[in-house]
């Protein structure tokens, strides 16, 4: 997988453009953090960010995508973890987990993809691990619901917190 991506530390693929499907419903990109970024470069393999666009939700007024899941690779290119990043990381329009189920079930950015094999793999992963992804999204919702509303804005902007929740593949 890492050979296909051919992405060095600090780079983003499939540069210079990310992958957005032909219907403008789904979007993904892959990147690796700089080697010195110890908090985000734990596995050395980088990670994918998967999004649903405002168009998928019928939201023509929003310009912000909604982050579905991040998929981390280990240093050998194998599956390392799934995680939900903090809002400052993705600058997204967060939505409750219940509204994201359909997007996770239907995620497919194969049309118009310069990286067809990877797009197929990502679609298969979201279906194979659908229940686990939904559990992470629900965990995020429970965590945030327990947090006083007045503290959320500060939490979302705290650059020391890059991941809200994570499931590591052991």
Over which residues does each language-model region extend?
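N-terminal domain-onset segments
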Residues: 1-20
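Aromatic- and glycine-enriched beta-alpha-beta binding-site module
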Residues: 14-82
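Short, well-ordered helical secondary-structure segments
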Residues: 4, 58-60, 154
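Mixed-charge (acidic/basic) macromolecular-recognition segments
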Residues: 78-170
């Amino acid at each position: 997988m890492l050979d296909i991506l051919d992405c060095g530390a600090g780079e983003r693929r499939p540069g210079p453009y990310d992958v957005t499907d032909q219907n403008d419903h789904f979007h993904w990109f892959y990147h690796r953090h700089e080697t010195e970024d110890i908090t985000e470069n734990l596995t050395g393999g980088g990670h994918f960010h998967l999004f649903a666009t405002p168009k998928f939700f019928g939201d023509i007024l929003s310009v912000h995508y909604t982050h579905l899941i991040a998929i981390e690779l280990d240093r050998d290119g194998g599956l390392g973890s799934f995680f939900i990043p903090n809002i400052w990381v993705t600058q997204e329009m967060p939505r409750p987990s219940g509204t994201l189920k359909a997007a996770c079930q239907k995620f497919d950015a194969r049309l118009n993809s310069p990286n067809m094999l990877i797009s197929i793999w990502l679609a298969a992963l979201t279906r194979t691990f659908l229940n686990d992804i939904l559990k992470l999204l629900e965990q995020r919702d429970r965590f945030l619901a327990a947090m006083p509303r007045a503290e959320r804005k500060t939490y979302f902007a705290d650059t020391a917190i890059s991941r809200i929740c994570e499931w590591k593949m052991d």
